[in-house]
Structure formats: structure tokens, C-alpha cells
Amino acid sequence: MTRTMVVTVRFCTFLINVDDEWDANPWLPEQVSLDPRPPLKHRPKLNFDMSAFSSRGMRLARTLQRRYTRRPLPTYQQPTPFTFRILPAEDREWCSISTMAIAENYEDVLKGKYPAKEHARKVAKWIIEKGGDKNGTIYLEAQKQKLNEDNDGEAPFRQRRYFFYLSGCELPDSYLTYEIPNDRLTLFIPPVEPEEVIWSGLPMSVDEAKAKYDIDDCKTTRDINAHLTSTSESAQSTIYAIPEQVSDNITFLSYKDKEFKQLKPAIEYCRVTKTDYEIALIRKANEISTAAHIAVMKAASKAKNECELEAVFLKSCVERNAKNQAYHSIVAAGENGATLHYVNNAAPISEQNLLLLDAGCEVDCYASDITRTFPIKGHFNEESLAIYKIVLDMQHQCINALKAGVLWDSIHELAHKIAIKGLLDLGILKGDADAIFKARASVAFFPHGLGHYLGMDTHDTGGNANYADKDVMFRYLRVRGTLPERSVITVEPGIYFCRFIIEPYLKDEEKKQFFDEKVLEKYWSVGGVRIEDNILITKEGIENLTPTPKEVDEITALVQSA
């Protein structure tokens, strides 16, 4: 016998048929209230049919699935007992969710202002705790609008992240000051230049900037030196700036002290932990990039060249008003996937089995970074499926091990140990697992770090990497140390069959004993498999910000659906 459970998630109500022998209490979160009937015995068997959903409906259903069951979603074509509709309030009688994941309702969060003042206070607090001047002033500059060399065309503009973090302002040629004792944030934007208006239209006005940004005052850039002089004379204080980001026309002469070493590390440290608004931006970037990844999966079987699929991804992002990419897309078919940062994206697609797509858009200076590997024609061959399952297991286990305070080095080690077990099972590696780990032989297949912080930069600040590490397993690990709550980190294990990397191991007297070259020969054509999600670290665990399909049945169904 089954019953219908009603669950409300983000203003929409789901009807789910569940097994009658269900004990909800052990697995529902505290925020869920159940109707007071006797507990049942087992978890519900939840099945989801996504085929008729809009993109928003799919997102809601995925939210529900992630929160209420650990079972993966089945293929989209399967009929299931799952239904979706809006119910009147009087019919919502089983349970409802009263709170959400952090910034899960990102559209609502982003209706507010970017929290520039909160960031400024956070940076000032760090400076003061390090012995800085509590009466000081922070000064930052936006990126200058530049022309391409030898012509009058404008170069692509990318806002300075240090400036944006304390302003939320995307305008070039701007300045800001933050007076620490007065908690006063002032933005300086370019004035109206009549000749420029002829070509580019009216720029943002001072009043518009005051309304848009989380600032206390706004002036034009003509006022910056007068403002700095008045601030320094009134406080006889210290100016904090980034030396290589101070224009020649700016004067700090009237300040008692000029401090050029603390501000940059202060901002880099503070950027590691994210506000709700920042998390909302990363969620939105992930949602847009997910739609683009799905579009590529659906287009893959008919593509003739990697560049066609890169175009599909870019088109999907731009259609959703995400015109900037967080990094150059990697669209690698077959053995091209063995090159970690392959960016040529111009090779023909013919007999290759796999496509590795590492691509993510940027939303208001915040990045997404997603990698999916899938069979171009919708069917894995034996070798590629075996490697894919190992990498997927690496990612699942590593994500499940995460929470605030976890040592990232240990998660990276876990990924290698899972890879070793999988490669031993396939016969690619041979011998004792511990001996293979100690010899670092698995680095031949997994040479990069497990992940990196994500935020305004794809490889975000604060990771404390040690690229001089003599231990090859950790040399390219971009994050060292423990993970703080509210940091966002990528988890991107991979296994690659790159001759340039592996062949030296086959010639090494100490390490060659661990490789079966005859078995290895069957796997060169796999190229590389990488799976990457963006993970928010919480006190008790994680929230996965990346809803992009990755289970075998999901991705094969999407490719075949074309």
C-alpha cells in the first residue's frame, strides 16, 4: 500500500507516492514538521519523472531529491508515480519545509544589494586584529578601461576583484574609500563627459549609484584627491592601499602612514568565506551553466567538431544574460581529454567515445566551475564506463567526507586511495595498495589537486598552495589546511591516460612494477574523465551548488534524447 506525501519547497507543492512502511523521523531534517501519525519502518521509495518539467520545475525537484533521499534520479524517460502540481493551502496536510538551504532562493536574495559595507567591515576587522590602525582609511581602484594595443578598439573589460569586493561596482575608472572609524564607504565614479555621451550614451549618475550600491556616499572621480586630503587631515591616520593599483595622479601625502602590505592579504583572507549574497550569485551561475551543459549533451551526438559544442555552451549562457565566462572553456573529445587544460577546442569529432566539458559562466563577477564527461553518442564503451564509475565514486566519497574543519589534504588523499582501488580492480595497477600510495604511483593518472576555492575568481584566493612541495601528490593542491564554514570549494577528481605523464612512470625502476602495460594499452583511447561540482562547506556537512546531471543513467539519457 502507498500513501501520498505532500511536500512544499519554494512556494510549490510536490505530491509523492511513498511506501506505506516509512519511518520519516530518522532522515527528515529538523525544519520539517510531520503530521502526528505513528512512525513507519523504512525510507520512502521516491521516484522522479523529470520529462515534463520546465527548467524551474526541474530545479525544484532536484532540490527535493537532494534533501529527502540519497537515491539518484532515474532517467528522464521512465514513467514514475511522481507528480507535480500546485495545491490549495487547505490540502497541504502532510509536511512542509519552513527553511531553505543557504541562499537557495537566490532570485529573492539577489533583489537586495551586494554587501559591500559588510565586506569592508570584515576587511577592516582583519587589519585591526593584525595590529593595524583603527583610525585608518582603505583605498581601492577599479580597473581602467584600456584600448587594444596599436588600435582604438576597447580591450575586454574585467573588473578588479579587490575593488568589487568592497563596492559591488562594475564601472571602470572608479575609486573607493572606506573610513574605518566612521564606518563610511564612499564611491567615486567617472563624471559625465559630453564627447563620450555622443558615442556611448549617458553613464550612471551619482544618484543612480547611491541607489544601486551598498555605499554611504557617491561622488565623481574629480573629487577623490580632495576627499583623501580631508580624510587624512581629520584623523592623522594610515592609508591602506595596494601599491600596484594606485594611479599616478592620486596623492597620499597628507597621511601620517602609508601601508601597502596588509590590504591585499586582508581581502584575500576575507574572500574565502561567503555571504548569502555571494552564495546566491554562485548558485545562479551554476544554474545557468547547468542549462548550458545540458544543451551541449543534447547537441553532442550530431556535432562534427569540438568548436560547435563550445558555441552551444556560450550561446546558452548568453541567452540567459551571462555574457562572461569564468574561464576559457575546455571542450575535449577523446584523447584530448587527457590534457588537463586543453583549450584548442577545434578538433574533429568522429570515433571518440567521450567528451570532457569543463566550462562555467560568471554572474556579476562570481564564477561557476563545472566539469562533466559523457559519451558523445550516448553509450559508454566498456573501458570508458569503468573509468567513469571510478571517478564518480571518488567524487561521491570525497563530497560525503566534507564539513567545516576538515583537512583538505586528507580528502585529496582519500581520492587517491579510491582511485588506486579502482585501478587495481581493473588490473591497470598491480601490487599492494599501500605500496602504490606511498610510491605516489597514482599521480600518473591523477596529477592535479582535488579542487580549489571558488568565488570571484575561478581559482579563488586564500588557498595557501605550496607549489614547491617536494611531495608530488600535493604539489598542485591549490588549497592547504582546513576548510572553513561558508567557503566554496570545487571537488574535481579525474583519471587521465596521458602518455607524456604516464610513460616516465613506466620507465622508473621503483614505480614501473605497479603498472600492467598490457592492460593499460586498452585504456589510452579513454583520454580523460573528470567530474567537478561546486560545494558549499557548512558546519555539519555540505550543500552541493551544482545541479548538473552526472549519474550514468542521467547523462546517457540526455545525450540519447537528442
Swiss-Prot record:
Gene Ontology biological-process entries: proteolysis
Q: Protease: is it a keyword of this entry? A: yes
Tell me which Gene3D superfamilies the record gives.
Creatinase/methionine aminopeptidase superfamily (3.90.230.10), Creatinase/prolidase N-terminal domain (3.40.350.10)
- Which keywords has UniProt assigned to this entry? Aminopeptidase, Hydrolase, Manganese, Metal-binding, Metalloprotease, Protease
Which metal ions or organic cofactors does this protein require, according to UniProt?
Mn(2+)
Per its UniProt entry, which superkingdom is the organism in? Eukaryota
Query: Which residues does the record give as Mn(2+) 2 binding sites?
Result: D358, D369, E532
Cited InterPro entries: Aminopep_P_N, Creatin/AminoP/Spt16_N, Creatinase/aminopeptidase-like, Pept_M24, X-Pro_dipept-like
The record's cofactor note says: Binds 2 manganese ions per subunit.
Q: Does the keyword Thylakoid apply?
A: no
Could you tell me what reaction this enzyme catalyses? Release of any N-terminal amino acid, including proline, that is linked to proline, even from a dipeptide or tripeptide
Residues given in the record as Mn(2+) 1 binding sites: D369, E492, E532
Q: Mention one GO molecular function.
A: manganese ion binding
Q: What EC number(s) does its UniProt record assign?
A: 3.4.11.9
**Top EC category:** hydrolase
Family recorded in the similarity comment: Belongs to the peptidase M24B family.
Function, please?
Catalyzes the removal of a penultimate prolyl residue from the N-termini of peptides.
**PANTHER family documented for this protein:** XAA-PRO AMINOPEPTIDASE 3, XAA-PRO DIPEPTIDASE
The entry's protein name is Probable Xaa-Pro aminopeptidase PEPP
As recorded in Swiss-Prot or TrEMBL, the protein's gene is named PEPP
